[in-house]
Each structure stands twice: as structure tokens, then as C-alpha cells.
């Protein structure tokens, strides 16, 4: 009698099928995790830009510093929203768009594209409106998918 050691073809096919099912489930879960991480990164950028603007404006208002925003903003003169927004864009050049990592994440001026944090200065009202579109999935029309904050220039 012949003694065969090894796996049968059926056993090998079952193992390959199980591995295929696990891989398919893993890819779907991984895509969900990466999308969620990008959305959270865009929201985090929004919060950091708003806090940075407020802190640097306050630094100038206190009069303890001659410059703010990594030296890009002269605190010894009166600055309007446009000047502050432009200085902030330069100071925050290291921020990247989570959805397009080769692009800058913070821009001076309106931009509704996904992942960009846009600073729109309003010199008349003395404010900078900071907005971020963190997703463009229109499957749920009831959600705006945009964060917006206003930073006052005092």
C-alpha cells in the first residue's frame, strides 16, 4: 500500500478560498480606516489653524513681541486680515492636504476642494473665516461636510 503524505487538492482549494475571503474583508476595512484617518486629519488641520491664528494675533496684541507667525508678521504696525492671512499661509506651509499630500494644506483665499483649509480674510469686518471641506461624499445631503470658524482681528 502506498503511503501518501500531503494535502489533497480539495484541502488546498479550501485554504485558498479562506485566504481570499479574509483578504477581501481586510481591503474593505483598510479603505474605511484610511478614509476616516484623512477626514480626521483635515478636521485637525482646521482646529490647529484657528488656534494658531488666534494665538499669533494675541501675541501681537499683547505688545510683547515685535513679530509673529515665524517672523512673517510685523507686530509694530497695524495689520489687516489680508496681511495676517498671507503671513499665516507662509508660516503654515508645512501643512499638507490629507487627500492630496503633494499639495499645500493651508491656503490664503477661498478654496472648496476637499482637504484644503482656506483662510478668507475680510478686512471690512476685521476677521478671517477659516473653512475646511473634509469630505465630498454627497450620499447624505443633510450633512454639510464643511467646518467653518471665524477668527476676529482685534
PLM features per residue range, with description:
Residues 39-63:
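Extended, polar beta-sheet/loop recognition surfaces of beta-rich domains
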Residues 1-47:
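Amphipathic alpha-helical segments typified by the pilin-like N-terminal helix
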Residues 55-154:
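Periplasmic/extracellular, small/polar-rich flexible segments of pilin-like filament-forming proteins
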Amino acid at each position: 500500500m502506498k503511503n501518501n503524505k500531503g494535502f489533497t487538492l480539495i484541502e488546498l482549494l479550501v485554504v485558498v478560498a479562506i485566504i481570499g475571503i479574509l483578504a477581501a474583508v481586510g481591503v474593505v476595512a483598510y479603505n474605511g480606516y484610511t478614509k476616516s484617518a484623512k477626514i480626521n486629519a483635515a478636521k485637525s488641520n482646521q482646529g490647529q489653524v484657528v488656534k494658531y491664528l488666534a494665538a499669533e494675533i494675541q501675541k501681537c496684541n499683547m505688545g510683547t513681541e515685535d513679530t509673529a507667525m515665524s517672523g512673517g508678521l510685523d507686530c509694530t504696525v497695524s495689520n489687516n486680515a489680508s496681511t495676517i492671512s498671507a503671513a499665516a499661509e507662509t508660516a503654515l506651509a508645512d501643512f499638507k492636504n490629507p487627500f492630496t499630500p503633494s499639495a499645500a494644506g493651508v491656503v490664503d483665499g477661498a478654496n472648496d476642494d476637499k482637504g484644503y483649509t482656506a483662510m478668507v480674510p475680510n478686512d471690512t469686518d476685521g476677521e478671517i473665516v477659516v473653512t475646511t471641506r473634509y469630505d465630498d461624499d454627497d450620499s447624505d445631503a443633510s450633512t454639510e461636510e464643511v467646518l467653518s470658524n471665524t477668527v476676529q482681528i482685534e
